[in-house]
């Protein structure tokens, strides 16, 4: 069963990700949610998960004897016109003696329950780990040191610095990303510069759709806080936040397209992969303080080196060529498209809006059967869906073996 020995393969995310921050609490709260994020089936009616290793998520707070529990199926639905629509199941992990099946002993047969245990676990014991209160604690990222679920399932990489006010869109950890095949797959999937930028832009768009909404007041605060702490809100131009683009001095990055689109321009996300963190700026830079009549000026000089062996080296060079001192220019592939013949004809006296061809009305699709569309979501289903923070397949930027490592967005 799932409690067998590891086969040598692993579904664990890339080992370059260093896990810091809080660990799962040792004692549970009054909530009844899983401490960990879910694994999700890729298709409807998928069989129950099988694990290459023990199937128990990593938790350094627990002894080996306590590393046992169960995965429980959670049916999922999303609202649709006239009712709800089923989506692939999610499976949540609970320690033995906790969660919705707290009354079961390890190994008891029940539909929608898969028991798992690490080697050396005392499956006769019951856990005091408790469950999670979603109002107080975020889901803890899944990590499997000895192998994850089979290829019918996926889970999303959650960075530990994710706040409660927003949701992260990051790399999906799935069976296809196993360690032995990672090096080969990186090279095959590195893609062209156009694909890289398109995927980067898609990440930003998805993050805006699924994340918490930014109010006008919040956007204004983001754009007008202390200059060195500003970020560009959605819908803002670069020069609205950081001033006009220039040449040969501070503020010289960004062409006209980037200035107009702001963070929607995928090149912004691509280049942020090379920008140092605040700690790197402070401790890895040459810092030069200088007293001026208006105050203290801090000059921070930092150099990021992108190896010529980096799969994205040419792409970064191209973006720099376009955007450094790029004011007044646009990418060659961003020339305005000529208007169609029908729309470019000069207006005449005989022209009238009434003569324009009306778009054909879409035929109404027949209503789905009762087994596909049911009533509105129940309160229990809404609660269950509330902890499903990643319903859609994430959009992944494959940076390859970049100079700074993987998954740095």
UniProtKB/Swiss-Prot annotation:
CoV N NTD domain segment(s): 31-156
Domain CoV N CTD intervals: 215-331
Region of interest (Dimerization), ranges: 226-333
Locations listed in the record: Virion; Host endoplasmic reticulum-Golgi intermediate compartment; Host Golgi apparatus
Renumbered residue ranges of the record's region Disordered: 1-32, 44-69, 121-145, 164-195, 238-259, 326-409
GO molecular function: RNA binding
Pfam families reported in the protein's UniProt record: CoV_nucleocap
Record PTM: ADP-ribosylated. The ADP-ribosylation is retained in the virion during infection.
InterPro entries, sorted: N_prot_C_CoV (IPR044344), N_prot_N_CoV (IPR044345), NCAP_gCoV (IPR042547), Nucleocap_CoV (IPR001218), Nucleocapsid_C (IPR037179), Nucleocapsid_N (IPR037195)
Biased composition (Low complexity): 15-31, 164-179, 341-358
SUPFAM superfamilies to which the protein is assigned, alphabetical: Coronavirus RNA-binding domain, Nucleocapsid protein dimerization domain
Phosphothreonine modifications at: 378
Annotated Basic and acidic residues bias: 180-192, 247-259, 368-384
UniProt record similarity statement: Belongs to the gammacoronavirus nucleocapsid protein family.
Subunit structure: Homooligomer. Both monomeric and oligomeric forms interact with RNA. Interacts with protein M. Interacts with NSP3; this interaction serves to tether the genome to the newly translated replicase-transcriptase complex at a very early stage of infection.
Free-text function comment from the UniProt entry: Packages the positive strand viral genome RNA into a helical ribonucleocapsid (RNP) and plays a fundamental role during virion assembly through its interactions with the viral genome and membrane protein M. Plays an important role in enhancing the efficiency of subgenomic viral RNA transcription as well as viral replication.
Name the record gives this protein: Nucleoprotein
The encoding gene: N
């Amino acid at each position: 069963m799932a409690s067998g020995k590891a086969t040598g393969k692993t579904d664990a995310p890339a080992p370059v990700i260093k896990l810091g921050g809080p660990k799962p609490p040792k004692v549970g709260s009054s909530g009844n949610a899983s401490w960990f994020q879910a694994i999700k089936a890729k298709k409807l009616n998928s069989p129950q998960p099988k694990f290459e290793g023990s199937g128990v998520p990593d938790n350094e707070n627990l002894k080996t004897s306590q590393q046992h529990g169960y995965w429980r199926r959670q049916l999922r639905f999303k609202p649709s016109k006239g009712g709800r629509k089923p989506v692939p199941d999610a499976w949540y992990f609970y320690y033995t003696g906790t969660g919705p099946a707290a009354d079961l002993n390890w190994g008891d047969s029940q539909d929608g329950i898969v028991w798992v245990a690490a080697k050396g676990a005392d499956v006769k014991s019951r856990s005091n780990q408790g469950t999670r209160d979603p109002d107080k604690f975020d889901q803890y990222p899944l990590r499997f040191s000895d192998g994850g679920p089979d290829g019918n399932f996926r889970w999303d990489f959650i960075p530990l610095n994710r706040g409660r006010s927003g949701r992260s869109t990051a790399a999906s950890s799935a069976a296809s990303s196993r360690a032995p095949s990672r090096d080969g797959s990186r090279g095959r999937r590195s893609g062209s510069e156009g694909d890289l930028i398109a995927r980067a832009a898609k990440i930003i768009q998805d993050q805006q759709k699924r994340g918490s909404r930014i109010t006008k007041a919040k956007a204004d605060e983001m754009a007008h806080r202390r200059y060195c702490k500003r970020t560009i809100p959605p819908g803002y131009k670069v020069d609205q936040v950081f001033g006009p683009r220039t040449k040969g001095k501070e503020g010289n990055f960004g062409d006209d397209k980037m200035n107009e689109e702001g963070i929607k321009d995928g090149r912004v996300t691509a280049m942020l992969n090379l920008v140092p963190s605040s700690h790197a700026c402070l401790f890895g830079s040459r810092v030069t303080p200088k007293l001026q009549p208006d105050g203290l000026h801090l000059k921070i000089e930092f150099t990021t080196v992108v190896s010529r062996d980096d799969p994205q080296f040419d792409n970064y060079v191209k973006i720099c060529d376009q955007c450094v001192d790029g004011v007044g220019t646009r990418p060659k592939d961003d020339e305005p498209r000529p208007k169609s013949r029908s729309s470019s004809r000069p207006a005449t006296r005989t022209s009238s809006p009434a003569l324009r061809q009306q778009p054909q009305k879409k035929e109404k699709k027949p209503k789905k059967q009762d087994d596909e569309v049911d009533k509105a979501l129940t309160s229990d289903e809404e609660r269950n869906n509330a902890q499903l923070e990643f319903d859609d397949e994430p959009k992944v930027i494959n940076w390859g073996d970049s100079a700074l490592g993987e998954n740095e967005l």
